C-alpha cells in the first residue's frame, strides 16, 4: 500500500450525499450547512438557490477533504456577480428551478448521489451548468485556504520557482 487512497468519483458523491445541505434562512438571507459548521450570506440570490448551488458545486467537483464552506465561498462569487448582472441572476435562478423540477423536488434534498449525478449529466452542456462549473475552477481552486487540503504549497515564482524549491516534493501528482 502506497499510503494514498483511491476514491472514485461515485464513492465521493455517495459520501457527499450523506451530508446534504439543508438551507436555513436567517436575517439577510443567511444560508447555513446541515450542522451549521459553515454559513454564508446570500445577498442577491435567495437562500434556497444559494444552497442548491453549493450542493451542485460539491457534486460537480467532489473532494472529501473540503468542507462545504469552500464550496459556499465559490458560490458567493456568483452571488456577488449577480448583483450587477441581471442576466446572470436570471440564469442561476432559472437553472436551479429547472434542476429542482427535473429532480421532482429540491435538488439539494435528493439523497441518492447517482440520481444527482444523472441530473447534472443531463444539463452538462447547458450554459447554466457551464457557468457554475467554470466559476468553481477559479472560485474553488484559487482559494488559498483550500490549497493545503490539496497538498499544494502555493505559488513559487516569488520564491525562486519550483526548480529552486524542490519541484518534485509533491506527493499528489
Which residue stretches match the model-derived regions?
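C-terminal segment of N-terminal export signals and the immediately downstream linker at the start
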Residues: 7-11, 24-63
